């Protein structure tokens, strides 16, 4: 009986310790700590795995590794939204054109976007934006920005023209920006090299690592062409293999640019005079609601993430007319860093905007 009591107490103590550890971890992750972002930048800036730019009323308050090219993840979708607005303003596309959901679904890769595409569809249904299994082209663009749907982004790259979007990089003076390529087809790259290029399973990751960026893009475009045609895609039947080792390669191959590029772009959006008024109006229509704080006259943001990357671009003008732009980029994150940064980026941005005391720390 004594032995059973000892075992019982031991189990109780172990459970209590586990609960205490979980409670401490929960507090650590959820604790509002805008300083964490600054501390992270200070700790990792010499590794060149992060960058930060902050500008207020035209004055640069902070700049770290602003010329270092890093993976953008979904932050790159800002460029697609700007080109969308340009083509709307030039009447090259009709924002109210009705797009069949099926045209988007062919680019959707289940369980690879943290539920973004299904969440957008659910939201669109609630708002009665879907009629006869169709919705407007503008809704597709808003789904790309507000919900970060990769399927919508790939569709828009096709609709607007991949070459046209890549040409817009020069027009927007994004001088360090990599060329765009489809968002969803690269997810099939491991299955593709094993099935179509007959690479043994135990060698496929190494083959992917050794591909030049031009070769990688070329294969991604080939897969994309198959995905466009339902019959062709079924015929090839490429398996989806997205284990963490592959995701690291995929993440490293994402489109890259510098914080300086995106500071330039969001600055143009925030000053409201760099683009023709119809284009600016459409940009604001797409981004409206991405920042829900009433302290702003107008504001917008778009971030991106992978298991290793976290990025965010924010622009805002407060009710007193103060203009703030913030670009944060990071790579090589571990899971704890990623979660803590995600939890505190919005607090960090708000502190920069509202607190002179916090700005003195920059």
Where are the regions a protein language model picked out?
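Alpha-helix boundary/capping detector
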Residues: 110, 170-171, 182-183, 194-196, ...
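Short low-complexity stretches enriched in small and charged residues
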Residues: 7-9, 52-59, 99, 106-112, ...
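Active-site-adjacent loops and short helices of periplasmic peptidoglycan-processing enzymes
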Residues: 22-79, 83-190
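Structured C-terminal helix/loop/strand segments within mature extracytoplasmic catalytic/sensor domains
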Residues: 6-19, 25-38, 46, 61, ...
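Helix N-terminus capping/helix-initiation residues
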Residues: 102, 212, 355-356
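Mid-domain, small-residue-enriched loop/turn segments at the edges of structured enzyme/sensor domains
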Residues: 141-261, 265
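Carbohydrate-binding/catalytic loop surfaces
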Residues: 121-129, 195, 200, 308
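N-terminal secretory signal peptides that target proteins for export/translocation
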Residues: 1-3
């Amino acid at each position: 009986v004594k032995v059973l009591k000892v075992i019982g107490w031991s189990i109780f103590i172990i459970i209590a310790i586990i609960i205490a550890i979980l409670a401490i971890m929960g507090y650590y992750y959820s604790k509002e700590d805008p300083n964490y972002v600054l501390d992270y930048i200070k700790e990792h800036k010499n590794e060149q795995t992060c960058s930060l730019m902050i500008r207020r009323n035209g004055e640069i308050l902070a700049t770290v590794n602003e010329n270092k090219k890093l993976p953008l993840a979904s932050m790159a979708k800002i460029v697609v939204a700007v080109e969308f607005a340009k083509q709307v303003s030039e009447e090259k596309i009709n924002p109210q054109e009705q797009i069949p959901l099926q045209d988007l679904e062919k680019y959707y890769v289940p369980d690879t976007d943290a539920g973004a595409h299904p969440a957008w569809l659910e939201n669109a249904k609630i708002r009665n934006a879907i009629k006869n299994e169709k919705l407007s082209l503008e809704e597709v663009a808003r789904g790309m920005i507000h919900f970060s749907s990769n399927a919508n982004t790939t569709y828009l790259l096709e609709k607007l023209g991949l070459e046209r979007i890549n040409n817009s990089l020069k027009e927007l003076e994004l001088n360090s920006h990599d060329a765009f390529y489809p968002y969803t087809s690269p997810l099939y790259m491991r299955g593709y090299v094993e099935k179509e290029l007959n690479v043994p399973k135990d060698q496929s990751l190494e083959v992917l690592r050794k591909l030049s960026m031009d070769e990688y893009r070329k294969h991604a475009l080939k897969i994309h062409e198959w995905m466009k045609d339902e019959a062709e895609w079924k015929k090839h039947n490429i398996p989806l293999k997205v284990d963490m080792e592959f995701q690291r390669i995929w993440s490293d191959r994402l489109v890259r640019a510098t914080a300086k590029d995106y500071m330039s772009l969001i600055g143009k959006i925030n000053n409201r005079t760099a683009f023709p008024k119809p284009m600016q109006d459409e940009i604001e229509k797409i981004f409206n609601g991405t920042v829900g704080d009433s302290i702003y006259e107008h504001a917008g943001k778009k971030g991106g993430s992978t298991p290793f990357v976290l990025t965010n671009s924010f622009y805002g003008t407060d009710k007193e007319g103060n203009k703030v732009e913030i670009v944060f980029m990071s790579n090589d994150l571990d899971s704890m860093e990623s979660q803590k940064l995600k939890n505190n980026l919005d607090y960090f941005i708000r502190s920069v905007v509202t607190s002179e005391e916090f700005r003195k720390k920059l």
